[in-house]
UniProtKB/Swiss-Prot annotation:
Annotated pathway: Carbohydrate degradation; glycolysis; pyruvate from D-glyceraldehyde 3-phosphate: step 4/5
Positions of the catalytic residues: K497 (proton acceptor)
Protein name: Enolase 4
Role played: Required for sperm motility, function and male fertility. May be involved in the normal assembly of the sperm fibrous sheath and provides most of the enolase activity in sperm.
Bias kind Pro residues: ranges: 188-206
InterPro entries named among the record's database cross-references: DD_ENO4, Enolase, Enolase-like_C_sf, Enolase-like_N, Enolase_C, Enolase_N
Oligomeric and partner information: Interacts with ENO1. Isoform 1 and isoform 4 interact with AKAP4.
Keywords, alphabetical: Glycolysis, Lyase
Post-translational note: Synthesized as an approximately 70-kDa precursor, which then undergoes proteolytic cleavage to an approximately 60-kDa enzyme; HOATZ associates directly or indirectly with ENO4 to mediate this process before its transport to mature flagella.
Class in the EC hierarchy, top level: lyase
PANTHER family given in the database record: ENOLASE, ENOLASE 4
Family: Belongs to the enolase family.
Amino acid sequence: MGDEDGGRRGGITRDLQKLKQQAMAYYQENDVPRKLEDLLNSTFYLQPADVYGHLKANYFSKLAKPPSICKIVGKTILDGLGLPTLQVEISCTIQNFPKYICAVAIPTHFEVVENALPEALDAEDSERAQAVNTAVQWINQSITEELWGLVPSNQAEVDHRLRTFFEHKVQEDKERKELEKSQEELVPAPPPVTLPPPPPPPPPPPSKKKGQKAGRRDTLLEKPVSPPEPPEPVLHGSMAIGAVSLAVAKASATLASDPLYLTLASLKHDQEQPSTFSMPLLMGSVLSCGKSSPGKLHLMKEVICIPSPGLTAKQSVELLLEIQKQVNRAMETLPPPKQETKKGHNGSKRAQPPITGKVSHLGCLTINYDAIEQPLLLLQGICSNLGLELGVNFHLAINCAGHELMDYSKGKYEVMVGTHKSAAEMVELYVDLINKYPSIIALIDPFRKEDAEQWDSLYAALASRCYLIAGAASGSVSKLLECRNISTLKSHGLIIKHTNQTTMSDLVEITHLINGKKLLAVFGSTDSESSDDSLVDLAVGFGARFIKLGGLSRGERMTKYNRLLAIEEELIQRGVWGFSEEHNFSFFQEDATATMAEETLGLLDSIFPTEVIEESAKT
């Protein structure tokens, strides 16, 4: 019996000795004894009141593994218009426990068309829902596995994996479409329908008689309008890529107790912090007289106020609020419209519709004006009432939305109901407008992207005093990076929108390209915005010159204005707030002079053949 007890005790002793040896080896491999000795010695000299709090906060937490991504959740939420969009939540493993970190929402890329047919609206609603649902599936089924275990601060690796994942999805979609096409080709096609021959071309215009007033040569040689380019293809689910990339960047900032814009600035400047941050200049919409407005005027989808660069963001927002208040008051006090003398079909006099305003999805009043001068005269009157000087305290910008104005049946832009102008005539219209109202310093999308020649002409005429900014005409960030050419249209800058598969690394690259070309970066909101305010951090972190947020009459847009104010206050407190430079057109003026010289040279080269054609026509 004693031998058995002795053997048992000997076995336990050997097991304990073995465990002790394993423990010693484990702790020595992790350098625990030395670190604990140093910790206890330093703690003794410090003698903190909360010993264990000091040990955890100032030592053990620093020795722990960095937080790593353990879960990504995609959800469908509603944006500011009640339409579905995507939200992404990030959770990380911190000291062996999963913990929720942050959430972001990303807007969809769809434009809001207020006067669309019900069939078109239903089709777009279906497309939108499919895009969001596919993104949610990608995130919950695949992307979490792709990014599991990565440290959020490793943005480059995160974006690389997201890009690879997206490329595989694009290839899968391509193969699926090819398979569907091959299956359709197996089905016998119906016999072709014989079409009647096309009508003969119209007779040439009569030749000018001697003494007749000479018309413009560009009218005689006017080119037919080019058809619109097919819309840029967007793969359903692509918004998952951009949303997850943004969510990881925000998670990295949250874990480091830094604001998001600081993390983004580090990405752009190779982990170095700028000494100062300049706030982007506000572009605040105050009026809308575009294609969807009930009045005759279509040219001004947005009339935008740009407060002076010498104002702080807080002063700029206060100025915009006061202008908007005055606009609302003006709409309430307008006299009733006069009746027209023209009679309708029933013989009664037809009354002009009242000038009333409603808040558009862009956050500003939609007003039915009938002339280009009306909204500008309204703002001039408001300036007089407030003791402000238009062109000094603030300037104006016009979002023309040229792609929405084109009437393809006539091949011209419909600037007002019943008033159509060719692309060449639009150049003259804009030049006359800027000559009459020099306080307008920016035109957004004055033409379609297909009218590159008119972009060049307008740039040559106005580059020294008015910014030409490409919004819808510039294409998506992904398309620009794919082409590696951001100067296809002659402009001063581009509007950048964070949508679809655009990652943080893509935004770093596109802003570097824009800065390298000495162009202006404008971060802009989409038509249908969510309540997420990350757009402001993107603009500040990546050093945008302007930020276009829409009007101050919708909650989802006011969250972004509030974020702008919070960032400015924080920068001032930290002593890193920088002044914004005044509007400078000198570089663009030199570029425009060179462009005009090239155009003049080209015109001189083409005079001889044109004269030959005219002489041959006379004979």
